[in-house]
């Protein structure tokens, strides 16, 4: 990874050369030549897309069309380009999800090998993970398009901030660099996996001819990595547009910008502006079409590159499968094939080594109550080391970790009755029955009153006889026609003297009705006297209740 030994200048991150001086003298800042340039921190040399140096600059219309901007929303394609750039650059988020730094650890490589000498134990780790794109310096779009030495001193003001197309080009270049780095790391990882291990294992009879063949194959695979086709450079036509000079204007634009054009009527100026804007729109549309065609060409090239990479990976996979098949067919792996055929599920992680087992250990029966510690420690066995028969230990007999295993138990034997120290009847204002004798009417207060209502008898409906229209309209059966039955109601005899058997009050007893309703025929004076007497009785009744409460409260005094 290449690093710059120079001190980083904050002014080098932003290009303020376009803002120096007035707009009429857009000369380059003399300090740009002395500012340090930072190289992209990439290991592999990648050809970044750049434009050929040219002095041709596109000129825009003389009229300021951005003065009255229409509310048209987003530019077509702006949102997709922005999301693509943010997704590529990981804007605002740290790239903690990539596990590229773990690619050097393969499952076949043991971190600690106690069977080998300390001098042979080498750790193969590569700390060359690609740097995040958020640490890259801000790239000036003018430096991507052409060199600063080839810029014309008469060019107009360029862009201060990079456009969407320049950001997309930069993101594409960075993605290609990361893809090439990942591919190289994948090739190196596969080479490390297929290379014979230098650490010493259990001694096995090796054939020098087979070892020589394996070495030759590995060397040939290292000499023939997956070839990558050169990336095609994408040419973008997103040059900074400058204001048109008077020499490049046509007659209509000169007339519109001159003093004579200001003297024209509003209608003529509107027609002239429409004509100029239509011409500018056609030129911009042509430019957009050319840009889209260039992007389509870039996508086609990228698709071809991906296909070539996929083909290279398929070829590499085929070569690795052939190598594995050839290695397994060699006599050096005969013991491994025998063990694999005998026990296909027990595939070891390292190189196959036959482990000597003591027949006495197989006769040892595992106790039923086995603690989890026993299974955890017994499974950690080093491959390639002779197993020493040991007596398994039941850790459940030690009662470890049972210090705080108590379970408190609480039982209720008896609950004393709480004395009724407060009389609720005294506080409520109602007379209690601790002096007087209790009556049976106190229990009736708890019961819910039942509302009496008269029972409704359902009227019995008599079914009507079916009527046959054909039979009734046929004159041949006129003699058999039935006449409608006439019902006559006979008045019932009512005993007006006693009125027995007649419900006058709708199911309510007459005693209750007479007790509630009383017919009084009196004058106004008698009525007022009766009302006053009733009020006096009501007040005296309330006074009696208050007096009784006071007597109850002052009884013990």
UniProtKB/Swiss-Prot annotation:
GO terms for molecular function: DNA-binding transcription factor activity. Residues 254-271 have a biased composition (Basic and acidic residues). Residues 264-327 form the bZIP domain. SMART domains: BRLZ (SM00338). Residues 289-296 are annotated as: Leucine-zipper. The keyword Secreted does not apply. InterPro entries: bZIP, bZIP_sf. Residues 267-286 are annotated as: Basic motif. The keyword Ligase does not apply. Its main location: nucleus. It holds the Pfam family bZIP_1. Residues 171-194 have a biased composition (Low complexity). It is found in: Nucleus. This is BZIP-type transcription factor MBZ1.
């Amino acid at each position: 990874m290449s690093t710059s030994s120079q001190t980083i200048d904050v002014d080098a991150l932003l290009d303020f050369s376009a803002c120096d001086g007035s707009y009429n003298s857009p000369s380059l800042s003399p300090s740009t030549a002395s500012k340090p340039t930072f190289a992209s921190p990439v290991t592999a040399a990648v050809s970044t897309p750049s434009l050929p140096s040219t002095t041709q600059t596109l000129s825009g219309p003389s009229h300021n069309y951005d003065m009255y901007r229409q509310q048209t929303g987003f530019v077509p394609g702006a949102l997709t380009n922005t999301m693509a750039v943010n997704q590529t650059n990981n804007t605002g988020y740290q790239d903690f999800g990539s596990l590229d730094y773990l690619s050097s650890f393969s499952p076949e490589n043991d971190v600690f090998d106690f069977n080998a000498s300390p001098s042979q134990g080498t750790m193969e780790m590569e700390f060359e993970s690609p740097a995040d794109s958020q640490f890259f310096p801000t790239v000036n779009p003018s430096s991507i398009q052409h060199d600063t030495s080839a810029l014309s001193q008469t060019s107009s003001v360029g862009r201060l901030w990079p456009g969407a197309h320049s950001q997309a080009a930069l993101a594409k270049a960075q993605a290609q660099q990361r893809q090439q780095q990942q591919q190289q790391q994948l090739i190196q990882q596969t080479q490390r996996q297929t290379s014979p291990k230098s650490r010493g294992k259990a001694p096995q009879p090796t054939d020098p001819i087979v070892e020589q063949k394996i070495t030759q194959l590995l060397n040939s695979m290292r000499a023939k990595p997956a070839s990558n086709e050169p990336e095609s450079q994408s040419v973008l036509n997103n040059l900074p547009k400058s204001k048109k000079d008077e020499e490049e204007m046509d007659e209509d634009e000169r007339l519109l910008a001159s003093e004579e054009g200001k003297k024209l009527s509003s209608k003529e100026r509107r027609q002239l502006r429409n004509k100029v804007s239509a011409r500018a729109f056609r030129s911009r549309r042509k430019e957009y079409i050319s840009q889209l065609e260039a992007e389509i060409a870039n996508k086609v090239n990228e698709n071809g590159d991906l296909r070539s990479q996929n083909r290279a990976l398929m070829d590499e996979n085929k070569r690795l499968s052939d190598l594995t098949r050839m290695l397994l067919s060699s006599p050096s792996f005969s013991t491994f094939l025998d063990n694999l055929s005998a026990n296909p599920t027990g595939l070891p992680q390292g190189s196959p080594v036959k482990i000597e087992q003591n027949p006495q250990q197989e006769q040892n029966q595992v106790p039923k109550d086995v603690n989890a510690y026993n299974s955890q420690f017994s499974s950690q066995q080093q491959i390639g080391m002779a197993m020493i028969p040991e007596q398994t230990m039941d850790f459940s007999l030690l009662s470890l970790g049972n210090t705080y295993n108590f379970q408190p138990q609480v039982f209720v034997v008896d609950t004393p009755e709480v004395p009724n120290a407060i009389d609720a009847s005294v506080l409520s204002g109602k007379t209690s029955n601790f002096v007087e004798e209790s009556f049976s009417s106190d229990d009736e207060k708890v019961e819910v009153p039942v509302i009496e209502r008269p029972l409704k008898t359902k009227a019995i409906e008599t079914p009507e006889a079916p009527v046959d229209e054909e039979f009734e309209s046929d004159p041949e059966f006129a003699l058999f026609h039935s006449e409608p039955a006439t019902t006559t109601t006979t008045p019932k005899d009512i005993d007006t003297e006693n009125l027995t058997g007649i419900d006058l009050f709708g199911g309510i007893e007459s005693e209750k009705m007479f007790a509630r309703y009383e017919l009084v025929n009196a004058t106004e004076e008698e009525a007022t006297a009766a009302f006053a007497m009733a009020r006096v009785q009501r007040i005296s009744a309330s006074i009696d209740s208050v007096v009784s409460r006071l007597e109850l409260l002052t009884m013990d005094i």
